[in-house]
């Protein structure tokens, strides 16, 4: 899906895919023709390309070849195993096309490794000069970590405070309650008028 989205994007230049659990920490110019990012496991000396943040041009040869190879692997199956056309597949394609110079250091998006997601709730600091931070929400779920709580501590708590998420939540909640009450009142009024 993400490869097709970038390849067929309506803008002349293609687009940028960013996972929904990626937080923008700082503005960064994304005018490079290609962008591939990396992540690490426990060993931060062994980074690898990942699919959480990527960019390539609309109708690019790279995108066309990537999609064609993915379609061969999928072979019209409705279901394939996770990762089959994911990070390793993308990394191999980047290498085959000689695009390694467009690969970002893992710290630009994934400075906290996916396997260390509990750090988000610890009193650990991050490099706030980096442009993005990947939260790896699926790992939160697997580790029974609650995202829907207003944590006061840790990296996640700092981000919630910085972006005033609790205030936003309360405003939305108030609007929803008001809207629901208005809708209920309107419904009841119409209902009783019909009964009369």
Q: Which residues fall in each region the model found?
A:
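A conserved donor-nucleotide-binding helix/loop in the catalytic core
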Residues: 1-18
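Glycosyltransferase-associated regions of secretory-pathway enzymes
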Residues: 1, 18-196
């Amino acid at each position: 899906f993400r490869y097709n989205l970038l390849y067929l994007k309506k803008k002349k230049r293609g687009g940028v895919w960013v996972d929904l659990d990626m937080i923008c920490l700082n503005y960064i110019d994304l005018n490079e023709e290609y962008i591939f990012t990396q992540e690490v496991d426990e060993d931060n000396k062994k980074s690898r390309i990942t699919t959480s943040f990527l960019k390539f041009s609309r109708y690019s040869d790279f995108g066309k070849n990537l999609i064609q190879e993915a379609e061969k692997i999928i072979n019209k199956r409705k279901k394939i195993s996770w990762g089959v056309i994911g990070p390793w597949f993308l990394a191999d394609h980047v290498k085959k096309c000689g695009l390694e110079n467009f690969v970002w250091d893992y710290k630009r998006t994934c400075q906290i490794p996916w396997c260390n997601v509990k750090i988000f709730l610890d009193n650990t600091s991050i490099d706030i000069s980096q442009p993005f931070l990947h939260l790896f929400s699926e790992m939160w779920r697997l580790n029974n970590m609650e995202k829907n709580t207003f944590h006061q501590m840790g990296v996640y708590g700092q981000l919630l405070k910085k972006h005033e998420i609790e205030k936003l939540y309360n405003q939305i909640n108030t609007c929803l309650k008001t809207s629901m009450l208005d809708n209920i009142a309107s419904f009841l009024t119409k209902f009783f008028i019909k009964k009369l």
